[in-house]
Regions:
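Positively charged n-region of N-terminal signal peptides that target proteins for export
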Residues: 1-4
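Exposed, flexible binding/inhibitory loops of compact, secreted disulfide-stabilized domains
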Residues: 20-140
């Protein structure tokens, strides 16, 4: 009985020691958001807070062609990322900003600041987000 109890204690201690080893390093995680400086070939202008969400290369082919599509394929991994295309017309001074909130997975809130000039200009912004990131444009 004493030998069985001693063996059980050693087995428990061994499991405890092996369980406290350093964990394997996590896989490298890319940035939550990346600005992509590629202009879509086929732009559908809408409101600033209704971006087009591209989740696959097939979706991207509807908005990008030729060199723009090749550049997008080189910069974005559609297996791990999505693409947001914001396109609207407004004042030349309109600004689109974003804030990355510290949580896991991260949350990104896009905000719009209207310009003060009365000129009508096209605005196009393309962002690549990790697919596990939650995002919202405007609102709360």
């Amino acid at each position: 009985m004493k030998k069985a109890l001693t063996a059980l204690c050693f087995a428990s201690m061994g499991a405890l020691l092996f369980g406290l080893e350093k964990p394997a390093a996590p896989a490298p995680v890319g940035p939550a958001i990346t600005k992509v400086d590629i202009r879509p070939s086929k732009i559908e202008f809408s409101r600033w807070n209704t971006p087009v969400e591209l989740t696959s290369l097939e979706d991207a082919k509807k908005h990008f062609e030729g060199d723009a599509l090749d550049q997008l394929k080189a910069k974005v991994d559609f297996g791990n990322q999505i693409v947001l295309v914001f396109a609207w017309r407004g004042s030349g001074q309109d600004k689109l900003d974003y804030v990355v909130m510290e949580s896991f997975p991260e949350q990104i809130a896009f905000s719009y600041r209207p310009g003060r000039t009365r000129d009508l200009r096209p605005h196009v912004h393309v962002f690549a987000l990790r697919s596990n990131v939650k995002w919202r444009a405007g609102g709360k």
